[in-house]
């Protein structure tokens, strides 16, 4: 079993929103590894960061991604930092991976002031700019396609991503 599509991208790129729209369009399930982690641990990611730290969260994330890649037949959205792990990048080889690319102004508008996003709690705009610069090469390395999300609706993006998927 393998996902029909794996979505990667920075916070605010639309992975969850576009992923849900894409899954609905294709008539398949939608899965988000961030939501999987929250369900497993029983608390929001922001609390995991506060209580156990980022390193612990990344360990949970690697496990969640590995499980999801092996058990999901629909659309899978990964957390924004999942591609930082070499283990995850290697696991994505052979999958259809779409990078939802977002520029800073749209990302800032979409994520707001970082509510519920632990890495954006302090100076969200500067942090988001740094995250975009740091992670963009990793997204590009794993992606089989890139879709620019700026100024477009989730439904428009779902149609574009669907057109990129193998038949």
Curated annotation (Swiss-Prot):
Reactions performed catalytically = shikimate + ATP = 3-phosphoshikimate + ADP + H(+)
Superkingdom of origin organism: Bacteria
Q: Required cofactors, per record?
A: Mg(2+)
EC number(s): the record gives: 2.7.1.71
Q: Which GO terms describe its molecular function?
A: ATP binding; magnesium ion binding; shikimate kinase activity
Please tell me whether the keyword Nucleotide-binding is annotated for this protein. Answer: yes
Which amino acid positions bind substrate, per UniProt? 34, 58, 80, 135
* SUBUNIT field: Monomer.
The protein's name in its UniProt record: Shikimate kinase
């Amino acid at each position: 079993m393998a996902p029909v599509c794996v979505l990667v991208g920075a916070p605010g790129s639309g992975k969850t929103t576009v992923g849900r729209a894409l899954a609905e369009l294709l008539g398949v399930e939608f899965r988000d590894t961030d939501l999987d982690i929250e369900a497993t641990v029983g608390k929001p990611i922001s609390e995991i960061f506060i209580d156990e730290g980022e390193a612990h969260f990344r360990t949970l994330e690697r496990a969640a991604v590995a499980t999801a890649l092996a058990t999901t037949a629909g659309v899978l959205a990964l957390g924004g930092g999942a591609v930082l792990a070499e283990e995850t990048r290697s696991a994505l080889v052979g999958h259809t991976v779409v990078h939802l690319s977002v520029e800073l102004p749209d990302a800032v508008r979409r994520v707001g002031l970082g509510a519920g996003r632990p890495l954006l709690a302090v100076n969200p705009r500067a942090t988001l700019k740094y995250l975009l610069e740091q992670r963009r090469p990793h997204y590009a390395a794993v992606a089989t396609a890139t879709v620019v999300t700026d100024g477009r609706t989730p439904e428009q993006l779902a149609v574009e991503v669907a057109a990129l998927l193998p038949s």
